[in-house]
Amino acid sequence: MDAREIIEMIAKAKKKTPIVAYIKGDLAGIDFSSFKFFGDEKFGILFGEYEDFKKLLEEHKEKIEDYHLEVKARNSALPLADITKYKARIEPGAIIRDMVEIGEGAVIMMGAVINVGAVIGEGTMIDMNAVIGGRAIIGKKCHIGAGAVIAGVIEPPSAKPVVIEDEVVVGANAVILEGVTVGKGAVVAAGAVVTKDVPPYTVVAGVPARVIKQIDERTKEKTKIVDELRNLE
């Protein structure tokens, strides 16, 4: 997705502050048409917008005895994705923005964050607390380690997105900076900071990362992707 398209969409989107409110009181006769309402004349649960709830409280303060408010976001421009559309394993606590592509058999672990415009290939695992920035492109059968950061490039809009090709393994807490391409089958060591392109089938390590060797059979065995973890049945 083009950065300028994302920027224009965010700029023009109606900003939302979604809430869940639990209210009790004499609720008979109150107009809840601005909300999704579940309840009866004494207690109800409301899903809606904060400004609408403020107005409701002001208009019916004599009837509402008590309430508890949960604010999900403030002036949010983009919703979270409907994860039911993905043929992937998505664990509790993952945060995925709308307009993210996730391939079949991918695995998104607890605490992972994936921003708008990102693409996750088939069979790729995004491990716990990894951050995939806006417009990042990750290929098939990759493993992005726990706590890794794949930089996003929505601002500035001219920046080139990160591209991680197929069958790449990125170690825990590694950082891939804007504009970098990591070639097919490469391995990025844990904690590395990658500032320039990584050739295919090489191992890079360090800060800044540099090539330390070519992929060999021992490295392949240590970084092997386990297909059983991608099984959705």
From Swiss-Prot:
Q: What is this protein called?
A: 2,3,4,5-tetrahydropyridine-2,6-dicarboxylate N-acetyltransferase
What Gene Ontology biological process does one annotation of this record name?
A: lysine biosynthetic process via diaminopimelate
Q: Name one GO molecular function term.
A: tetrahydrodipicolinate N-acetyltransferase activity
Q: Name one Pfam family in it.
A: Hexapep
Q: Which InterPro entries match?
A: DapH (IPR019873), DapH_N (IPR013710), Hexapep (IPR001451), Hexapep_transf_CS (IPR018357), Trans_hexapeptide_repeat (IPR050179), Trimer_LpxA-like_sf (IPR011004)
Catalytic reaction annotation: (S)-2,3,4,5-tetrahydrodipicolinate + acetyl-CoA + H2O = L-2-acetamido-6-oxoheptanedioate + CoA
> Keyword set for this entry?
Acyltransferase, Amino-acid biosynthesis, Diaminopimelate biosynthesis, Lysine biosynthesis, Repeat, Transferase
Biological role: Catalyzes the transfer of an acetyl group from acetyl-CoA to tetrahydrodipicolinate.
Gene name, please? dapH
Which Enzyme Commission numbers does its entry carry?
2.3.1.89
- Pathway(s) where this gene product acts: Amino-acid biosynthesis; L-lysine biosynthesis via DAP pathway; LL-2,6-diaminopimelate from (S)-tetrahydrodipicolinate (acetylase route): step 1/3
Family as reported in the entry's similarity comment: Belongs to the transferase hexapeptide repeat family. DapH subfamily.
Q: Which domain of life is it from?
A: Bacteria
Which top EC class is given?
transferase
